[in-house]
């Protein structure tokens, strides 16, 4: 199930013949193609050769696990748009997790073009201008909250305060 946001109905769930794995695999393959330096941040996914150089060969199972996590996070974000405290808490926490893995705030923005590409390829005509713009806005919001968590790794989230 792919989730997308529209201005008409806040958000909608639509069933497509595409699953999270297909969208995210397309996104990450594109990401590693257009941002090859980012492969070093994914040591469990991207394989190294005997010369200690990054290879295109990837651990499919680890990529799939990460892909599902990413898309479930995006889906949860869209479904939580009306509960900004919860959404902010989750995204800040995800940012804190990423900074512990040496992901820098400026890297988060680098993923959008590849996600945009992956959604376009996989959703086809359903990924029209309105849907694309809605996803872009959601991604900007998510990125801002993740960056907040990255810049404040010790910030308590709502979940931790409960």
Locations of regions flagged by a protein language model:
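Globin-like tetrapyrrole-binding proteins
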Residues: 1-162
